[in-house]
Protein backbone atom coordinates (compact mmCIF):
# COMPACT_ATOMS: atom_id res chain seq x y z
CA UNK A 1 0.00 0.00 0.00
CA UNK A 2 1.20 3.49 -0.79
CA UNK A 3 2.04 5.87 2.07
CA UNK A 4 0.61 9.34 2.68
CA UNK A 5 3.04 11.95 3.99
CA UNK A 6 2.87 15.55 5.13
CA UNK A 7 5.20 17.77 3.13
CA UNK A 8 4.12 21.06 4.67
CA UNK A 9 1.61 22.36 7.20
CA UNK A 10 0.69 25.89 8.23
CA UNK A 11 -2.08 27.84 9.90
CA UNK A 12 -3.32 31.37 10.20
CA UNK A 13 -3.05 33.19 13.49
CA UNK A 14 -6.14 32.63 15.62
CA UNK A 15 -8.25 35.78 15.66
CA UNK A 16 -10.82 36.68 18.29
CA UNK A 17 -14.31 36.20 16.88
CA UNK A 18 -15.84 39.26 18.51
CA UNK A 19 -14.30 42.37 16.94
CA UNK A 20 -10.98 40.64 16.32
CA UNK A 21 -8.21 41.13 13.78
CA UNK A 22 -10.07 39.16 11.12
CA UNK A 23 -13.41 40.94 11.52
CA UNK A 24 -13.04 42.36 8.00
CA UNK A 25 -11.46 39.25 6.46
CA UNK A 26 -13.66 36.60 4.91
CA UNK A 27 -13.37 32.86 5.46
CA UNK A 28 -12.52 32.30 1.79
CA UNK A 29 -9.60 34.71 2.13
CA UNK A 30 -8.25 32.97 5.23
CA UNK A 31 -8.40 29.71 3.28
CA UNK A 32 -7.01 31.01 0.00
CA UNK A 33 -4.03 32.67 1.66
CA UNK A 34 -2.92 29.33 3.06
CA UNK A 35 -3.48 27.48 -0.21
CA UNK A 36 -1.34 30.05 -2.01
CA UNK A 37 1.29 29.87 0.71
CA UNK A 38 1.65 26.09 0.45
CA UNK A 39 2.42 26.40 -3.26
CA UNK A 40 4.79 29.33 -2.77
CA UNK A 41 6.66 27.53 0.00
CA UNK A 42 7.01 24.36 -2.09
CA UNK A 43 8.10 25.39 -5.60
CA UNK A 44 9.17 21.82 -6.35
CA UNK A 45 5.51 20.79 -6.44
CA UNK A 46 3.79 21.34 -9.79
CA UNK A 47 0.37 22.85 -8.98
CA UNK A 48 -1.03 21.10 -12.06
CA UNK A 49 -0.53 17.74 -10.32
CA UNK A 50 -2.93 18.58 -7.48
CA UNK A 51 -5.68 15.98 -7.50
CA UNK A 52 -8.08 17.63 -5.09
CA UNK A 53 -8.48 20.34 -2.49
CA UNK A 54 -10.32 18.86 0.50
CA UNK A 55 -11.44 21.51 2.97
CA UNK A 56 -13.27 21.17 6.27
CA UNK A 57 -15.99 23.61 7.30
CA UNK A 58 -18.95 23.14 9.62
CA UNK A 59 -21.27 26.07 8.96
CA UNK A 60 -21.48 25.84 5.18
CA UNK A 61 -23.62 28.88 4.57
CA UNK A 62 -23.20 32.60 3.88
CA UNK A 63 -19.52 33.21 2.99
CA UNK A 64 -18.72 29.61 3.92
CA UNK A 65 -21.39 28.18 1.64
CA UNK A 66 -21.59 26.79 -1.90
CA UNK A 67 -18.44 24.68 -1.56
CA UNK A 68 -15.95 27.04 0.07
CA UNK A 69 -13.18 24.64 -0.93
CA UNK A 70 -13.73 25.48 -4.60
CA UNK A 71 -14.36 29.16 -3.97
CA UNK A 72 -11.14 29.50 -2.00
CA UNK A 73 -9.06 27.42 -4.42
CA UNK A 74 -10.19 29.58 -7.34
CA UNK A 75 -9.43 32.67 -5.28
CA UNK A 76 -5.98 31.27 -4.54
CA UNK A 77 -5.18 30.55 -8.16
CA UNK A 78 -5.01 26.79 -7.73
CA UNK A 79 -5.20 25.33 -11.26
CA UNK A 80 -8.77 24.82 -12.40
CA UNK A 81 -7.91 21.21 -13.22
CA UNK A 82 -7.75 20.40 -9.50
CA UNK A 83 -10.95 19.29 -7.85
CA UNK A 84 -12.24 20.80 -4.62
CA UNK A 85 -14.69 19.53 -2.04
CA UNK A 86 -15.88 20.77 1.34
CA UNK A 87 -16.33 18.13 4.03
CA UNK A 88 -18.20 18.26 7.32
CA UNK A 89 -17.57 16.03 10.30
CA UNK A 90 -18.33 18.93 12.62
CA UNK A 91 -15.30 19.59 14.88
CA UNK A 92 -13.29 16.89 13.11
CA UNK A 93 -13.85 18.26 9.60
CA UNK A 94 -10.29 19.16 8.63
CA UNK A 95 -8.89 15.99 10.15
CA UNK A 96 -11.50 14.17 8.09
CA UNK A 97 -10.10 16.05 5.08
CA UNK A 98 -6.66 14.64 5.92
CA UNK A 99 -8.10 11.15 6.25
CA UNK A 100 -9.86 11.38 2.89
CA UNK A 101 -6.68 12.53 1.14
CA UNK A 102 -4.63 9.84 2.88
CA UNK A 103 -7.05 7.09 1.87
CA UNK A 104 -7.00 8.33 -1.72
CA UNK A 105 -3.21 8.24 -1.77
CA UNK A 106 -3.08 4.80 -0.17
CA UNK A 107 -5.43 3.41 -2.83
CA UNK A 108 -3.76 5.10 -5.79
CA UNK A 109 -6.46 7.72 -6.37
CA UNK A 110 -4.11 10.69 -6.55
CA UNK A 111 -0.70 11.65 -5.23
CA UNK A 112 -0.91 15.37 -4.38
CA UNK A 113 -3.58 17.01 -2.23
CA UNK A 114 -4.14 20.27 -0.42
CA UNK A 115 -6.23 19.71 2.69
CA UNK A 116 -7.31 21.87 5.59
CA UNK A 117 -10.23 23.75 6.97
CA UNK A 118 -11.65 27.03 8.13
CA UNK A 119 -14.26 28.54 10.38
CA UNK A 120 -15.00 32.23 10.74
CA UNK A 121 -17.12 32.07 13.87
CA UNK A 122 -17.35 35.84 13.99
CA UNK A 123 -19.09 35.99 10.62
CA UNK A 124 -21.02 32.70 10.71
CA UNK A 125 -22.09 31.75 14.26
CA UNK A 126 -21.86 28.12 15.33
CA UNK A 127 -25.63 27.66 15.58
CA UNK A 128 -26.60 29.71 12.52
CA UNK A 129 -29.67 28.18 10.88
CA UNK A 130 -29.45 24.89 12.78
CA UNK A 131 -32.83 23.12 12.88
CA UNK A 132 -32.76 19.66 14.44
CA UNK A 133 -35.39 17.15 13.37
CA UNK A 134 -38.09 16.93 16.08
CA UNK A 135 -37.99 13.14 15.87
CA UNK A 136 -34.36 13.12 16.98
CA UNK A 137 -35.62 13.51 20.55
CA UNK A 138 -36.83 9.90 20.48
CA UNK A 139 -33.21 8.72 20.44
CA UNK A 140 -31.12 11.65 21.64
CA UNK A 141 -31.78 14.09 24.47
CA UNK A 142 -32.12 17.71 23.42
CA UNK A 143 -29.23 18.58 25.72
CA UNK A 144 -26.98 16.29 23.65
CA UNK A 145 -26.97 18.99 21.00
CA UNK A 146 -25.74 21.54 23.53
CA UNK A 147 -22.00 21.05 23.75
CA UNK A 148 -21.58 22.77 27.10
CA UNK A 149 -24.12 20.51 28.76
CA UNK A 150 -22.43 17.41 27.37
CA UNK A 151 -19.20 18.64 28.93
CA UNK A 152 -21.01 19.09 32.25
CA UNK A 153 -22.30 15.52 32.03
CA UNK A 154 -18.92 14.02 31.13
CA UNK A 155 -17.18 15.96 33.87
CA UNK A 156 -19.68 14.80 36.49
CA UNK A 157 -19.40 11.17 35.41
CA UNK A 158 -15.63 11.31 35.84
CA UNK A 159 -15.47 13.35 39.04
CA UNK A 160 -13.84 16.38 37.42
CA UNK A 161 -14.02 19.27 39.88
CA UNK A 162 -14.28 22.97 39.14
CA UNK A 163 -10.76 23.41 40.53
CA UNK A 164 -9.33 20.78 38.19
CA UNK A 165 -10.95 22.51 35.23
CA UNK A 166 -9.62 25.91 36.25
CA UNK A 167 -6.10 24.52 36.66
CA UNK A 168 -6.26 22.91 33.22
CA UNK A 169 -7.44 26.16 31.63
CA UNK A 170 -4.70 28.24 33.27
CA UNK A 171 -2.15 25.72 32.02
CA UNK A 172 -3.47 26.09 28.48
CA UNK A 173 -3.08 29.87 28.49
CA UNK A 174 0.30 29.78 30.21
CA UNK A 175 1.73 27.24 27.79
CA UNK A 176 0.30 28.96 24.72
CA UNK A 177 1.67 32.31 25.89
CA UNK A 178 5.10 30.80 26.54
CA UNK A 179 5.08 29.16 23.11
CA UNK A 180 4.16 32.48 21.55
CA UNK A 181 6.82 34.62 23.21
CA UNK A 182 9.50 31.94 22.79
CA UNK A 183 8.78 31.68 19.06
CA UNK A 184 7.56 28.09 19.09
CA UNK A 185 4.55 28.98 16.93
CA UNK A 186 6.64 30.89 14.38
CA UNK A 187 7.15 27.92 12.09
CA UNK A 188 3.46 27.07 11.90
CA UNK A 189 1.85 30.52 11.70
CA UNK A 190 1.60 32.06 8.25
CA UNK A 191 1.11 35.79 8.71
CA UNK A 192 -1.80 37.33 6.82
CA UNK A 193 -3.43 40.74 6.71
CA UNK A 194 -6.00 41.83 9.25
CA UNK A 195 -7.02 45.04 11.01
CA UNK A 196 -6.05 46.46 14.37
CA UNK A 197 -8.48 48.00 16.86
CA UNK A 198 -8.39 51.30 14.97
CA UNK A 199 -9.12 49.68 11.62
CA UNK A 200 -5.60 50.02 10.25
CA UNK A 201 -4.38 47.26 7.97
CA UNK A 202 -1.72 45.14 9.69
CA UNK A 203 0.18 41.92 9.08
CA UNK A 204 -1.03 39.51 11.76
CA UNK A 205 1.56 36.99 12.93
CA UNK A 206 0.34 36.25 16.46
CA UNK A 207 -2.59 34.50 18.12
CA UNK A 208 -4.97 37.15 19.38
CA UNK A 209 -7.02 34.93 21.68
CA UNK A 210 -4.39 33.89 24.22
CA UNK A 211 -5.00 35.50 27.62
CA UNK A 212 -1.68 35.44 29.50
CA UNK A 213 -3.27 37.28 32.42
CA UNK A 214 -5.46 34.24 33.22
CA UNK A 215 -5.06 33.02 36.80
CA UNK A 216 -6.81 30.58 39.10
CA UNK A 217 -8.19 33.57 40.97
CA UNK A 218 -9.67 35.20 37.89
CA UNK A 219 -11.23 31.94 36.71
CA UNK A 220 -12.67 31.23 40.15
CA UNK A 221 -14.78 34.37 39.84
CA UNK A 222 -16.58 33.19 36.70
CA UNK A 223 -20.05 31.73 36.93
CA UNK A 224 -21.09 28.45 35.27
CA UNK A 225 -22.40 29.38 31.84
CA UNK A 226 -24.28 26.30 30.63
CA UNK A 227 -25.87 25.08 33.87
CA UNK A 228 -25.97 28.16 36.11
CA UNK A 229 -27.62 26.37 39.03
CA UNK A 230 -25.52 23.22 39.35
CA UNK A 231 -22.76 23.39 36.77
CA UNK A 232 -19.00 23.80 36.88
CA UNK A 233 -18.14 24.66 33.26
CA UNK A 234 -17.42 28.35 32.69
CA UNK A 235 -16.48 30.45 29.69
CA UNK A 236 -12.94 30.36 31.03
CA UNK A 237 -12.73 26.57 30.91
CA UNK A 238 -14.31 26.33 27.45
CA UNK A 239 -12.56 26.70 24.10
CA UNK A 240 -12.40 30.30 22.97
CA UNK A 241 -14.44 31.53 20.01
CA UNK A 242 -11.95 32.28 17.27
CA UNK A 243 -11.54 32.68 13.52
CA UNK A 244 -8.87 30.79 11.64
CA UNK A 245 -7.76 28.30 9.02
CA UNK A 246 -5.12 25.59 8.74
CA UNK A 247 -3.73 23.72 5.74
CA UNK A 248 -1.47 20.81 4.80
CA UNK A 249 0.23 19.61 1.64
CA UNK A 250 -0.26 15.84 1.56
CA UNK A 251 1.55 13.65 -0.95
CA UNK A 252 2.35 10.06 -1.81
CA UNK A 253 5.70 9.26 -0.19
CA UNK A 254 7.58 7.99 -3.24
CA UNK A 255 6.41 10.98 -5.29
CA UNK A 256 7.61 13.38 -2.60
CA UNK A 257 10.99 11.65 -2.40
CA UNK A 258 11.37 11.66 -6.19
CA UNK A 259 10.86 15.43 -6.16
CA UNK A 260 13.46 15.86 -3.43
CA UNK A 261 10.92 17.26 -0.98
CA UNK A 262 11.38 17.20 2.77
CA UNK A 263 8.91 14.82 4.37
CA UNK A 264 7.79 16.16 7.72
CA UNK A 265 5.65 13.22 8.84
CA UNK A 266 3.94 10.08 7.63
CA UNK A 267 0.31 9.26 8.38
CA UNK A 268 0.77 6.03 10.32
CA UNK A 269 -2.89 5.27 11.12
CA UNK A 270 -6.33 6.86 11.29
CA UNK A 271 -9.66 6.18 12.98
CA UNK A 272 -13.07 7.56 13.76
CA UNK A 273 -15.44 6.27 16.42
CA UNK A 274 -18.85 7.02 17.86
CA UNK A 275 -19.99 7.40 21.45
CA UNK A 276 -23.13 8.49 23.27
CA UNK A 277 -24.08 11.97 22.11
CA UNK A 278 -24.73 12.93 25.74
CA UNK A 279 -21.00 12.60 26.40
CA UNK A 280 -19.77 13.59 22.95
CA UNK A 281 -16.48 14.80 24.44
CA UNK A 282 -15.44 11.23 25.19
CA UNK A 283 -15.01 10.43 21.49
CA UNK A 284 -11.20 10.75 21.47
CA UNK A 285 -10.90 7.69 23.71
CA UNK A 286 -12.41 5.04 21.39
CA UNK A 287 -11.03 6.78 18.28
CA UNK A 288 -7.52 6.77 19.73
CA UNK A 289 -7.80 3.16 20.82
CA UNK A 290 -8.76 2.15 17.27
CA UNK A 291 -6.01 4.21 15.64
CA UNK A 292 -3.36 2.80 17.97
CA UNK A 293 -4.53 -0.77 17.42
CA UNK A 294 -4.35 -0.30 13.65
CA UNK A 295 -0.78 0.92 13.97
CA UNK A 296 0.20 -1.87 16.36
CA UNK A 297 1.10 0.72 18.98
CA UNK A 298 0.13 1.68 22.52
CA UNK A 299 -0.52 5.06 24.08
CA UNK A 300 2.84 4.72 25.85
CA UNK A 301 4.53 4.72 22.43
CA UNK A 302 3.28 8.25 21.72
CA UNK A 303 5.98 10.86 22.31
CA UNK A 304 3.73 13.91 21.85
CA UNK A 305 -0.05 14.23 21.96
CA UNK A 306 -2.43 16.95 20.83
CA UNK A 307 -5.93 16.61 22.31
CA UNK A 308 -8.34 19.30 21.21
CA UNK A 309 -9.50 21.21 24.27
CA UNK A 310 -13.19 21.70 23.60
CA UNK A 311 -13.71 22.00 27.36
CA UNK A 312 -11.52 21.26 30.36
CA UNK A 313 -14.36 19.10 31.73
CA UNK A 314 -14.22 17.09 28.49
CA UNK A 315 -10.45 16.91 28.04
CA UNK A 316 -9.62 15.65 31.53
CA UNK A 317 -11.79 12.49 31.34
CA UNK A 318 -10.11 11.64 28.03
CA UNK A 319 -6.66 12.21 29.52
CA UNK A 320 -7.64 9.98 32.46
CA UNK A 321 -9.09 7.10 30.47
CA UNK A 322 -6.28 7.14 27.91
CA UNK A 323 -3.85 6.64 30.79
CA UNK A 324 -2.13 9.99 30.39
CA UNK A 325 -2.66 11.65 33.78
CA UNK A 326 0.93 10.99 34.87
CA UNK A 327 2.50 12.29 31.65
CA UNK A 328 0.36 15.33 30.86
CA UNK A 329 3.16 17.78 31.58
CA UNK A 330 5.61 15.87 29.39
CA UNK A 331 3.43 14.87 26.45
CA UNK A 332 0.00 16.50 26.20
CA UNK A 333 -0.76 19.90 24.63
CA UNK A 334 2.71 21.22 25.35
CA UNK A 335 1.97 24.52 23.61
CA UNK A 336 -1.46 24.93 25.16
CA UNK A 337 -4.67 24.13 23.37
CA UNK A 338 -8.05 25.33 22.22
CA UNK A 339 -8.97 26.85 25.58
CA UNK A 340 -6.25 29.42 24.87
CA UNK A 341 -6.12 29.37 21.06
CA UNK A 342 -9.77 28.81 20.27
CA UNK A 343 -11.60 26.14 18.32
CA UNK A 344 -12.62 27.41 14.86
CA UNK A 345 -14.63 24.30 14.15
CA UNK A 346 -13.65 23.39 10.59
CA UNK A 347 -10.04 24.44 11.15
CA UNK A 348 -9.12 22.62 14.34
CA UNK A 349 -8.24 19.14 13.09
CA UNK A 350 -5.59 20.47 10.72
CA UNK A 351 -4.53 23.02 13.33
CA UNK A 352 -3.78 20.51 16.07
CA UNK A 353 -2.06 18.23 13.54
CA UNK A 354 0.12 21.13 12.38
CA UNK A 355 1.00 22.03 15.97
CA UNK A 356 1.73 18.37 16.70
CA UNK A 357 4.13 17.97 13.76
CA UNK A 358 6.00 21.12 14.75
CA UNK A 359 6.24 19.89 18.34
CA UNK A 360 7.52 16.51 17.16
CA UNK A 361 10.24 18.26 15.20
CA UNK A 362 11.09 20.55 18.11
CA UNK A 363 11.42 17.60 20.49
CA UNK A 364 12.97 15.26 17.91
CA UNK A 365 10.09 12.87 18.61
CA UNK A 366 9.19 9.88 16.45
CA UNK A 367 5.50 9.23 17.10
CA UNK A 368 2.64 11.62 17.77
CA UNK A 369 -1.13 11.52 18.19
CA UNK A 370 -3.71 14.15 17.27
CA UNK A 371 -7.25 13.50 18.45
CA UNK A 372 -10.46 15.39 19.07
CA UNK A 373 -14.07 15.07 20.12
CA UNK A 374 -16.92 15.78 17.73
CA UNK A 375 -20.42 17.09 18.42
CA UNK A 376 -23.27 14.56 18.71
CA UNK A 377 -20.92 11.82 19.82
CA UNK A 378 -17.89 11.07 17.66
CA UNK A 379 -14.14 11.07 17.94
CA UNK A 380 -11.36 11.18 15.37
CA UNK A 381 -7.66 10.38 15.71
CA UNK A 382 -4.50 10.31 13.62
CA UNK A 383 -1.14 8.78 14.47
CA UNK A 384 1.83 10.51 12.81
CA UNK A 385 5.37 9.21 12.44
CA UNK A 386 8.45 11.25 11.59
CA UNK A 387 10.61 9.69 8.91
UniProtKB/Swiss-Prot annotation:
* Broad class of where this protein is predominantly found: cytoplasm
Q: What is its EC number?
A: 2.3.1.16
Task: Provide the alphabetized UniProt keywords.
Answer: Acyltransferase, Cytoplasm, Fatty acid metabolism, Lipid degradation, Lipid metabolism, Transferase
List the InterPro entries hit by this protein, alphabetically: FadA, Thiolase, Thiolase-like, Thiolase-like_sf_Thiolase, Thiolase_acyl_enz_int_AS, Thiolase_AS, Thiolase_C, Thiolase_CS
Q: Which reaction does it catalyse?
A: an acyl-CoA + acetyl-CoA = a 3-oxoacyl-CoA + CoA
Molecular-function GO term, any one: acetyl-CoA C-acyltransferase activity
Top EC group: transferase
Instruction: Give a single Pfam family match.
Output: Thiolase_N
Task: Name the GO cellular-component terms.
Answer: cytoplasm
GO process terms (BP): fatty acid beta-oxidation; phenylacetate catabolic process
Q: Does the keyword ATP-binding apply?
A: no
Pathway(s) this gene product operates in, as recorded in its UniProt entry: Lipid metabolism; fatty acid beta-oxidation
Subcellular location as annotated? Cytoplasm
Which SUPFAM superfamilies does this one have? Answer: Thiolase-like
* Catalytic residue positions: 91, 343, 373
What does this protein do, in the record's words?
Answer: Catalyzes the final step of fatty acid oxidation in which acetyl-CoA is released and the CoA ester of a fatty acid two carbons shorter is formed.
Q: Which family does it belong to?
A: Belongs to the thiolase-like superfamily. Thiolase family.
Share what the entry says about its subunit structure, partners included: Heterotetramer of two alpha chains (FadB) and two beta chains (FadA).
Q: Which NCBIfam families would you find in this protein's record?
A: AcCoA-C-Actrans (TIGR01930), fadA (TIGR02445), PRK08947.1 (NF006510)
What name does this protein carry? 3-ketoacyl-CoA thiolase
Q: Which organism is it from?
A: Shewanella amazonensis (strain ATCC BAA-1098 / SB2B)
Amino acid sequence: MKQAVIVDCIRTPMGRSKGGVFRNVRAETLSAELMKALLLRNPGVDPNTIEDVIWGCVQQTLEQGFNIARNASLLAGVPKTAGAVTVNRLCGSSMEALHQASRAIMTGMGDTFIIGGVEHMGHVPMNHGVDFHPGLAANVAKASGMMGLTAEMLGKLHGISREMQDQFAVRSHQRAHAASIEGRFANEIYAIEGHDANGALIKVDYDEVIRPETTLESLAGLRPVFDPANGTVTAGTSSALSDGAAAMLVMEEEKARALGLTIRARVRSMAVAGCDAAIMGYGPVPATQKALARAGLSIQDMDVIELNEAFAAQSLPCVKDLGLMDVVEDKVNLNGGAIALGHPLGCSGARISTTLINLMEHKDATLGLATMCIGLGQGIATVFERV
